[in-house]
Amino acid sequence: MSALNDKSVDNGRIARRFAALKAEGRAGLVTFITAGDPDLETCRAVLHGLPAAGADLIELGLPFSDPMADGPAIQAASLRALHAGTTARKTLDLVRGFRETDADTPVILMGYYNPIHAYGVDRFLADAIEAGVDGLIVVDLPPEEDEELCIPALKAGVNFIRLATPTTDDKRLPAVLQNTSGFVYYVSIAGITGAASADNAAVGAAVERLKRHTDLPVAVGFGIKTPEQAAEVARVADAAVVGSAIVTRLAGGLDADGKARPGLAEDVLGFVRELAGGVRGAAF
C-alpha cells in the first residue's frame, strides 16, 4: 500500500464498509448506475433506494460523450444522461442529496479524466469531498499519469481505485497497485463492459494472485448479469460489481421516447434486491 494513503483514506467509508463485510463473513455487492440516467429524478430515486435494496457500495458513473471502455449499454446510458442535462456539477449534487439521508454507504465516481480536467482537478476534488464522494475510478488514467489526479486525490483524502485485468501480468501489477487505495477492481474479462461472463475458476485464481500482491479488498466485475453469477463471484472475491445488467434493466423500462415508465425505479431496485440475495446467500 502506498505511503500516500493517509488516515482519511485508510479509515474512510470504503475501508469501514469492507471491514464490516469481513466481520459479517460475506462479500459485498457493488452497484453501478450512470448519474442522471435516464433523467435526474429517476436516477435520484434509484440512488436513494440502492442501500435498502442491498447495495453495499455504489459506483456512480460520471457521464461522458466518448466512454471508450464501456459497452453499448453504458455508452447509451451516458448519452441519455448527457441529453437530460447531467453535468459533473449535477452529479456531485446527486451525491450531496444522497448524503442527506445516508452517511455510511460508500459512493465512488467512475468515469473518464476529461470531465474532471475540464472542471479543474483541485476544484473537483474539493467539491467531491464536500459532496460526500469517497473514491474515484478513472479508467483512462494509467499509473504513469498518477501526478494528474491519483496523487492529488490521495493527498486530499479521496480513494483512487485502479482496475486490474487478465492481461495485467506480475511485472505490471506493482505499478498498478502502487497508489491504489480503497479496493482493487478486477475486470474479469479483457474488453468492454457488459461482455460475456468470465470462467469462475479463472476469476478465483486471479483474485488469489492479486491477494499475493496487496492487502486491499478485491472486487470483481464485468459480465455479471444474474444473482447466480453474482453469488459465484461472491464466493471468491470481496465484492461483486454489477453495472451493465442494472443499466440494461433500467433501459428496458423506457418508453419509445426514452422516458421513464411509471414504476421504473422500483423495478430496478427489485432487480438489485435479487442480486443482493445472490451475494448474501453465497458462502466463502
UniProtKB/Swiss-Prot annotation:
Pathway: Amino-acid biosynthesis; L-tryptophan biosynthesis; L-tryptophan from chorismate: step 5/5
UniProt-listed Pfam families: Trp_syntA
Catalysed transformations (reactions): (1S,2R)-1-C-(indol-3-yl)glycerol 3-phosphate + L-serine = D-glyceraldehyde 3-phosphate + L-tryptophan + H2O
Keywords: Amino-acid biosynthesis, Aromatic amino acid biosynthesis, Lyase, Tryptophan biosynthesis
Enzyme Commission (EC) number: 4.2.1.20
UniProt cross-references to InterPro entries, sorted A to Z: Aldolase_TIM, RibuloseP-bd_barrel, Trp_synthase_alpha_AS, Trp_synthase_suA
Cellular component GO terms, alphabetical: cytosol
GO molecular function, one term: tryptophan synthase activity
Catalytic residue positions: E59 (proton acceptor), D70 (proton acceptor)
Assembly and interaction partners: Tetramer of two alpha and two beta chains.
UniProt record similarity statement: Belongs to the TrpA family.
Known function: The alpha subunit is responsible for the aldol cleavage of indoleglycerol phosphate to indole and glyceraldehyde 3-phosphate.
PANTHER family: TRYPTOPHAN SYNTHASE ALPHA CHAIN, CHLOROPLASTIC, TRYPTOPHAN SYNTHASE, ALPHA CHAIN
Record's protein name: Tryptophan synthase alpha chain
Originating species: Azospirillum brasilense
